[in-house]
């Protein structure tokens, strides 16, 4: 960790385990934080794209039992196949 330069975590103050336990106001504030985080990352790192992710439940890869969201800046050629991560 971090996955790439500029990798950012958004973590709400109130403890909730997953996105689905957050109330509407918290979810709205998280989306606003995504926009602010994206702007800051773009100014500092100039990425070519982004992965934005929330893991919900152990089967989905959640290892920390507190809601958090990853904003991962991606750069051309940083991984062989950027489409591979969440496919079934």
Positions of predicted regions on the chain:
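HIT superfamily nucleotide-processing domains
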Residues: 1-88
């Amino acid at each position: 960790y971090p996955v790439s330069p500029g990798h950012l975590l958004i973590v709400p103050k109130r403890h909730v385990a997953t996105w689905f336990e957050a109330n509407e106001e918290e979810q709205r504030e998280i989306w606003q934080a995504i926009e602010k985080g994206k702007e800051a990352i773009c100014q500092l790192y100039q990425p070519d794209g982004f992965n934005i992710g929330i893991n919900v439940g152990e089967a989905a890869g959640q290892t920390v039992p507190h809601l958090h969201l990853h904003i991962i800046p991606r750069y051309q050629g940083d991984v062989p196949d950027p489409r591979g991560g969440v496919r079934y």
